[in-house]
Design a protein with these regions (language model features):
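Short amphipathic alpha-helical segments
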Residues: 27-28, 105-107, 146-148
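PLP-dependent enzyme catalytic core of the Aspartate aminotransferase-like
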Residues: 8, 121, 125-134, 140-170
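Helix N-cap motif at beta-to-alpha junctions
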Residues: 36, 115-116, 155-157
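Short hydrophobic/aromatic beta-strand micro-patches
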Residues: 33, 110-112, 151-153
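Conserved core segment of the aminotransferase class I/II
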Residues: 5-81
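Conserved glycine-rich beta-strand-loop-beta hairpin in the small C-terminal domain of fold type I
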Residues: 63, 79-88, 99-113
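Short, flexible turn/loop "capping" segments at secondary-structure junctions
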Residues: 23-24, 101-103, 141-144
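A short linear hydrophobic-aromatic micro-motif
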Residues: 88, 97-100, 133-138
Length: 170
């Protein structure tokens, strides 16, 4: 962002990390970047915890990701695309009444479970019956109570098991 114009360089602050893109969120590291000395002086006034809560491993992993991680990033993106398509195809084959779509630039599928008649909280029902956990749709608004969020940034084995557990719990 800071490179798009002189105005962006003068007033912009970029907050970023390698966490999501390179799938290293558990390593706790982020960056706050400015190209303006006055903004840097204001950023320097932030509480010390802001500067020192990153892990040393996260800092090294982030540096490696940004410097040499293009191949890794492309591999992660390819894997996520494969997992997304696999989830979509498994749902179509095993749970055709579950509505979903192929997400873009995400690793989360939004599943409409309303046709399964799982009660007021489908996520809780599936946790109890199938021992599979999802983010409950109601957390995203009253209109989403029959939805669950499925994070597919995991192995195909785990994704297949999760969908099989839904099928077995019905």
């Amino acid at each position: 962002f800071l490179t798009i114009s002189e105005t962006a360089r003068e007033v912009g602050i970029t907050v970023t990390s390698a966490s999501k893109g390179w799938n290293i969120a558990g390593l706790k590291s982020a960056l706050i970047v400015s190209q303006n000395r006055a903004i840097d002086e204001v950023l320097a006034l932030m509480p010390p915890a802001v500067k020192f809560r990153s892990s040393i491993l996260g800092a090294f992993a982030s540096a490696a990701a940004f410097k040499d991680g293009e191949v890794w990033l492309n591999s992660v993106i390819d894997t996520l695309e494969e997992n997304s398509l696999m989830v979509h195809n498994l749902l179509a084959a095993k749970l055709p009444s579950v509505k979903t779509h192929l997400p873009q630039s995400s690793y989360v599928a939004w599943l409409d479970l309303s046709a399964l008649n799982l009660g007021e909280n489908p996520a809780q029902t599936l946790l109890e019956r199938g021992k599979v956990a999802f983010n409950a749709g109601h957390m995203y608004g009253a209109q989403s109570t029959q939805f669950v969020r499925l994070n597919y940034a995991t192995s195909p084995t785990i994704l297949t098991e999760a969908i099989d557990r839904i099928v077995k719990s019905l």
